[in-house]
Amino acid sequence: MYIKGEHEFYCCGARVKISEGGIKILTEPLVKYCPLHEALTGIKKIDVEAVRRTIEMKVKGFGFCCANRLFKADPVVAYGASEMMQFWLEKKNVECAVVVCEGAGTVITTNGNLVQAIGSRLNGIIKTSPIPEIIQYIEGMGGKVLDASTAKIDQVEGVEKAFESGFKRIAVTVAGFKADVISKIRSLEAGIKAEVTIFSVCNTCVDSEKAEHIIKADIACASASKIVRSKVGGKALLQLGVTIPVYALTERGKNLILAYLADFKDKLVVFRTGKLPYSAEGRGPVLSEHVKSCCSNCCEDIKF
C-alpha cells in the first residue's frame, strides 16, 4: 500500500498530515483512552506513537489514502453515521447522501453501500487531494464527486448540487471542526425548500462556540467531547449508547433513528428518563489532562 497525495485529518483529537513523505503527527492527541478505539484497533493507551500506529494500520489494512483503497460495506459500529445513512438510503427514508471521502472530497450518492464503504473507518478529514483511482471507483458506483480536480470538501455546495439534481430529502455529514457549516446548511434548506438531515460527526475537538452550531443538527455524535455531551446532549430528544453517545436533536432525527432501530438485529434496552444526557462513570473516553482542565468548569456534571 502506497500513499498518494497529501491529506490532513484528526485521529483521537490529534491533527495528522499524511503524504508520500510519510505520516506526521502535528498536534498531541486530546484523548488518552477510548473504548471504541481499543475495540477497533486493540490499542489501549493513546499517545503520539499510538496515533501513528493507528494510521499505519489504516494504510496497510484497507489502503487509507492509497490508490488501491478497499471499499467494504460491512457494518463496523452499531450507531455510526455511515451505517445509519446506508440503511436510510436502502429503505428510501432519504433520497441521497452528501459525505466526504479522502482522495475525493465531497461526494453525492444514492448508493447506501458506497456511503458505508467510504465512511466505515474514516477519520475527520480536514483537507484532501485527488486520488484518481478512488474517484474512478466512486463514480463507477454511481457517486458524484463535487470537484474531481481538487477533491474540494464543501458540504454546503454538496447539498446545493444534490438539490439541483432533483433530490428533496438529503442526508449530509458535517465534521465538528467545520460546525459553522451546519448553520449555513440550515439557511440554505429554508431557501430551497428541501428536507436536509444533518448528522454532526467527528466532534472530539469541538469548543463551546462550535457546539452552538451543532445544536442545529438533527443528529450528533458526542465523540470524546465533554462539551458536546454537556451543551448538545442536554437538548437531545433521544440518546443512543453511553460510551460514545449519539443524540437525536430534532423530531426528524429521532424518527430516522427509530426507523434504524426497528430493523436492528441486536438486543436493545429502552428506558424513559427525565433528563439527558445519560452518562455512566467509567464508561467513556479518558481525556488528556490539559483538555480536562479546559472542560472542568462547563462540563463538571458529565462523568466518563
Where do the PLM segments sit?
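Conserved mixed alpha/beta catalytic, RNA-binding, or beta-rich assembly cores of soluble enzyme
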Residues: 1-304
